[in-house]
Amino acid sequence: MIDNNISNIVFSSTAAIFGNPKTKKIKECHKKSPINPYGKSKLMVENMLEDFAKAYELNVTCLRYFNAAGAHCDSHIGEDHNPETHLIPNVIKSTIHERDKLKVFGDTYKTYDGTCIRDYVHVTDLARAHLLALKMMEKHNGMFQYNLGNSDGFSVMDIIKSCERIIKTKISYTIEPAREGDPPSLIADSSLAKEVLGWNTKYSDIDNIIKTAYEWHKKQNLIKNKN
């Protein structure tokens, strides 16, 4: 960055840096105690960037995604990991491909239905946050961190029920042992991003988020069937 005269950077961080939160909604100042390698690696980079910002007078914004979800509204860009580990695409795939059996990891968490609760934020809302962060750093210098989510939590079972409403089919699943390193609940307090960046989510309804993901997966399946 220094060699190329670049002074602003936006880093894609994660809610996983907080570990098991002590409050229902997580503010930026919450203690960072990651419990899995992913969260630890992201926190390590945040700390490195803070050191670089001080040493080289760089401007750094860390955007802490909660659960990124959904697809572009025109269904051209969507979520396709291999192997897939994210809940929403796995639920959808289980209805499209019989071989992709849905597994629910843990049903004895201390939540209202025993399954993990997460805060889902649409990918295009996250993209807008990046643009707003870059614009903000044109006027302000330093190190900034923002939690990005809808500030509303949905359990694994809530997501399955939402998918059933969207896809209009009953979804079968098996209960598997809980995965080590999965906090029971992660919900963002995104008030700082709203106040400073002027950021608001356009996709606040979980059914609308899932609908964009389903339309993308459906389109991909149709394309594959044609080939």
Regions found by a protein language model. Give the residues of each.
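C-terminal substrate-binding subdomain of Rossmann-fold SDR/epimerase-dehydratase oxidoreductases
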Residues: N90-N227
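Structural signature of the Rossmann-like NAD(P)-dependent dehydrogenase/reductase core
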Residues: I9-S13, T61-R64, D119, N147-G149
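Active-site proximal helix/loop that lines the substrate pocket
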Residues: T14-I17, G70-C73, Y109, G153
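A conserved hydrophobic position in a structured secondary element of the catalytic/binding core
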Residues: S13, I26, A188
